Amino acid sequence: MKVLMSIKPKFVERIFAGTKTFELRKKLFKKTIDTIVIYSSFPEKKVVGEIIIDRIISSAPKPLWESLKNNLGISEKEYFEYYKNSKVAYAIKIKKVIKYKKELELKDFGIEKAPQSYQYINWRE
């Protein structure tokens, strides 16, 4: 199963460049997911590619930072600000990234509004 996930453009760039090999989240999917369809949020507002998931790591924020900080594509300040009220941090390990040749619109998925975090989808390119 796939999810459409909103990711800030600066992090999308780092994912495609290979400098960000984990996607961070505060909450995790309730269903088993193998692929994340990347929605590059404002100002791009385009569906730009896919992430094939390797595995998901969960931990308290501090030890997760200590073990993965060089692969997160985020500053220490940004990281701890993001997780400031969280007891658990989730790191989605990226196995493979697929960049679409042609960017897509949300309407191509039958979606009118971008998800705040993620949305389950049934779709194949």
Stretches with model-predicted labels:
Residues 1-2, 6-32, 45-48, 56-125:
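Contiguous surface segments at macromolecular interaction interfaces
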Residues 34-41:
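Short conserved beta-strand and strand-loop elements enriched in small hydrophobics
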